């Protein structure tokens, strides 16, 4: 099944219809990010069976022109947010790759699910939609993923780690680290070497590694 089919099926369920309706109502008087057409963008790139890596973020960037529907990613031409700066620092420390392109869609095209735990946010109000019920969507996505083997889960931060019990630990790789936010990255994220560990695992299980 394609991830696109999954999200279409979810939008037919009451919980997600209620969330969408609530967000639409807020948009009558408040700017919401990302743009409506980008809110389920992370599900547009590949089939569920093609999922190699899951990176679980928190909520979208709440400043203008930043959130683009892929966790941690921003479009070309924007300044790099602090979290993305630290992700690139960790990548360089690990694999000596000096990445400058902030648009992570090339990762998504290789089977990396760049999923936030909350898919919308009010402008300039971090975590403003955290209690809207998106956790049900994340749980349902993880239930679908349980049918897959040899997927690498990169869980950065406590919010991402809260979903660890939904993962089949016997047939997948789980890598945990502090969130890449400037507030916490120095606690071990910058030297976690998750990118090489991820690719080593994929190669071991005869899957194509990610070109980070």
Swiss-Prot record:
Protein name: Uracil-DNA glycosylase
Record bears the keyword Magnesium: no
Subcellular location: Cytoplasm
Enzyme class: hydrolase
Hydrolase among keywords: yes
A GO MF label: uracil DNA N-glycosylase activity
Any single Gene Ontology cellular-component annotation: cytoplasm
NCBIfam families cross-referenced by the UniProt entry: PRK05254.1-1, PRK05254.1-2, PRK05254.1-5, ung
Record key words, sorted: Cytoplasm, DNA damage, DNA repair, Hydrolase
